[in-house]
Amino acid sequence: MAELKNDRYLRALLKQPVDRTPVWMMRQAGRYLPEYKATRAEAGDFMSLCKNQDLACEVTLQPLRRYDLDAAILFSDILTVPDAMGLGLYFEAGEGPRFERPTDTIDSIKKLCIPDPEDELGYVMRAVSTIRRELKGEVPLIGFSGSPWTLATYMVEGGSSKAFEKIKKMAYEEPATLHMLLDKLADSVTLYLNAQVANGAQSLMIFDSWGGALSHHAYREFSLRYMQKIVDGLTRHADGRQVPVTLFTKGGGLWLESMAETGCDALGLDWTVDIGDARRRVGHKVALQGNMDPSVLYGTPERIHQEVDQILASYGEGTGHVFNLGHGIHQHVDPERAGSFINSVHELSPQYHK
């Protein structure tokens, strides 16, 4: 593997000195880019794009050709793991992901097998190794997975949900059944992420997109507990370097202290949290990633610049901050506005690292 030329992102996650705040964007390889749309059209559909290692590599690299970013993130989907468990993932126009065979009974959960990441998920591993090779050491590669709770919401509901009725019913009516599912998912995700590291991922991120839908105590029982299990089982060194781990619960501002106790290296923040307040609460333990509202990218370059300035000032001096959006970039954002965002971070952040 080529030697890493820009390790700013990894250093910031480990709270080591950097010359400026590193920046990347969640969903930076995505529908806001015309070149992504062209490659997706070539693939035919979303999962065909994910399962073609060369096309997955191409879309991963596209934002790096446009922007001076400090990290690449594997192009894939959080639902690859449940798909590999045999649930029959498909995408309904206008409705998002669906499963042919939801796991909403104890019998269906008992039948689930933990997928072999090098077999059923081998296409992801081939994409990871291809991307790592093609990056040529320019920036580090982030691997990722959904959290057990978030994956379980799709598996039990049969797809996307707003109220999470089925899985919350299971949580309170049959908690042992849900714990069985979450336990299998934690084991599956641990294997999956470790395989990504073995194939070249240099940092890991766990996306807990729906943890914020849980009550204060239910979050600890059904989400955090299983992210803790994963963190405990992850490969934390590879290629002579630490492999930093970031946890991101959307709507998780209530639980930053508890999340920081897991032993992860960094926490992702959504835009509802003040990053300066988050630093005061947990900055002695973990780095922070975030957290501009993605909708700010609809604003003028001046408005974007102002928001970046405000977030940098709120975090303050020193390392331990990776600039990002508070969630994925919206598909209708002008790519030029994303460029304004990245340029503003480059321009404004060095003063905080003298």
From Swiss-Prot:
Its EC number is 4.1.1.37. Signal peptide: none annotated. The record marks 77 as: Transition state stabilizer. It is found in: Cytoplasm. The keyword Aminoacyl-tRNA synthetase does not apply. Substrate binds at residues 27-31, 77, 154, 209, 327. The keyword Lyase applies. This is Uroporphyrinogen decarboxylase.
